[in-house]
Curated annotation (Swiss-Prot):
Enzyme Commission designation: 4.1.99.12, 3.5.4.25
Name this polypeptide is given: Riboflavin biosynthesis protein RibBA
Domain of life: Bacteria
Marked site (Essential for DHBP synthase activity) residue numbers: 134, 172
Functional pathway: Cofactor biosynthesis; riboflavin biosynthesis; 2-hydroxy-3-oxobutyl phosphate from D-ribulose 5-phosphate: step 1/1; Cofactor biosynthesis; riboflavin biosynthesis; 5-amino-6-(D-ribitylamino)uracil from GTP: step 1/4
Names of the cofactor(s): Mg(2+); Mn(2+); Zn(2+)
GO CC entries: cytosol
Functional description taken from the UniProt entry: Catalyzes the conversion of D-ribulose 5-phosphate to formate and 3,4-dihydroxy-2-butanone 4-phosphate.
Binding site for Zn(2+): 265, 276, 278
HAMAP family (alphabetical): RibA, RibB, RibBA
Region named DHBP synthase: 1-209
Catalytic activity: D-ribulose 5-phosphate = (2S)-2-hydroxy-3-oxobutyl phosphate + formate + H(+); GTP + 4 H2O = 2,5-diamino-6-hydroxy-4-(5-phosphoribosylamino)-pyrimidine + formate + 2 phosphate + 3 H(+)
Gene giving rise to this polypeptide: ribBA
Keywords: GTP-binding, Hydrolase, Lyase, Magnesium, Manganese, Metal-binding, Multifunctional enzyme, Nucleotide-binding, Riboflavin biosynthesis, Zinc
Length: 406
């Protein structure tokens, strides 16, 4: 039985109404992600009493979620030039309102509420703040939870959906013993304090029913060694980022479709490097789609080196030649083993009419990620590739350290 079935969550509509009224709600993320609940409220409605409640009962770090545009306007720089947070949380340098605005130490509930209110004031300038401080700004992704299923994005989305300034105040909820509160504890907490409680998964579904972040800008036929596919060009409505997908055949919306979500790999896909198994997986997926007569391959640009980029990927190759494995090399460079997000890929699949998938993957994380965006994986279809002398260790590390299933 899932948590959704076992526990009674509120509707997103109920949460939006409470946010509009200036109340807090609890937002819970996926059990396979952080598996925690945050107190969330609109920054526009923050008060010293609300900050005090978060500090007293939430006990976590009180943060201010802002849009990328607002972070730029206030000249809020990343806390570190190299973000190694496995979840990709974008912390900016902490701030306090300048003492000229009436703050003292910056840490009091009054001072923090004042800092937050000032940060969303239309007249605020970078010079209105001192750094470091006691309020921790977080930069949300432009597409909100449809791009990243995090509390940062959820808080901004809820404020925007409530018709308020798109910024949120969030605080993790811990138990009395200092450990993180999980869903059963959060349900008790919500009941005790009369708070609504929702999941990020439900917020994603709510938005998916009403909006999309991608638009198809062109389609054409693409002859390949495996048959004639259709290639579709997509553009992110907010960032302008471009992506492509290949399709063959047609399907009904309730029909499970053979799908491959493939991460960009210049060295493997284009230069046929033996260091990885990317090109063989790409070609095998196209072959399997052609054999089936229908299916989709989404090719995610920007996923080079599991999200670290081509230059860092080649730096990782250098380290591998010195004895580091692929995971150790990423960590030596200051990156988590895998930085990829699949929200845009999920949006493209939905636009192509896919709701149920037979997903061609060896990566269990990809299954969890795509299901988090409202798609159903009815079957995992393994892609079996014979190792070569150059990628044998690489494949073993993916199996042992990243949980890939071969």
């Amino acid at each position: 039985m899932s948590e959704r079935e076992e526990f009674k969550f509120n509707t997103v509509e109920e949460a939006i109404e409470d946010i509009r009224q200036g109340k807090m709600v609890i937002v819970v993320d996926d059990p396979d992600r952080e598996n925690e609940g945050d107190l969330v409220m609109a920054a526009e409605k923050v008060t010293p009493e609300a900050i005090n409640f978060m500090a007293k009962y939430g006990r976590g770090l009180i943060c201010l979620s802002l849009t990328p545009e607002r972070c730029e306007q206030l000249d809020l720089h990343p806390m570190t030039p190299m973000n190694t947070d496995p979840k990709g949380t974008y912390f900016c340098v902490s701030i306090d309102a300048h003492p000229k605005h009436g703050t003292t130490t910056g840490i009091s509930a009054y001072d923090r509420a004042l800092t937050i209110k000032l940060a969303i004031s239309p007249d605020a300038k970078p010079s209105d703040f001192v750094r470091p401080g006691h309020v921790f700004p977080l930069k949300a992704r432009p597409g909100g939870v449809l791009e990243r299923a995090g509390h940062t994005e959820a808080s901004v989305d809820l404020a925007r959906l409530a018709g308020l300034y798109p910024a949120g105040v969030i605080c993790e909820i811990m138990k009395d013993d200092g450990t993180m509160a999980r869903v059963p504890d959060l349900m008790e907490f919500a009941k005790k304090h009369n708070l609504k409680i929702i999941t990020i998964a439900d917020l994603i579904k709510y938005r998916l029913r009403r909006e999309t972040l991608v638009e198809k800008v062109a389609s054409a036929h693409l002859p390949t060694p495996w048959g004639v596919f259709k290639i579709h060009a997509y553009r992110h409505k907010l960032t302008g980022e471009e992506q492509v997908a290949l399709t063959m055949g047609e399907w009904k919306e309730d029909e499970p479709v053979l799908v491959r979500v493939h991460s960009e790999c210049l060295t493997g896909d284009v230069f046929r490097s033996f260091r990885c198994d990317c090109r063989p997986q790409l070609e095998k997926a196209l072959e399997m789609i052609a054999k089936e007569g229908k299916g989709v391959l989404v090719y995610i640009l920007g996923h080079e080196g599991r999200g670290i980029g081509i230059a860092n990927k080649i730096k990782a190759y250098e380290l591998q030649e010195k004895g580091y494995d692929t995971v150790e090399a990423n960590e030596k460079l200051g990156y988590p083993p895998d930085l990829r997000d699949y929200g845009i890929g999920a949006q493209i699949l939905r636009d192509l009419g896919v709701r149920k998938m037979k997903l061609m993957t060896n990566n269990p994380r990809k299954i969890v990620a795509l299901e988090g965006f409202g798609l159903e994986v009815v079957e995992r279809v393994p892609i079996k590739i014979e190792p070569n002398p150059y990628n044998k260790i690489y494949l073993q590390v993916k199996k042992d350290k990243l949980g890939h299933m071969f």
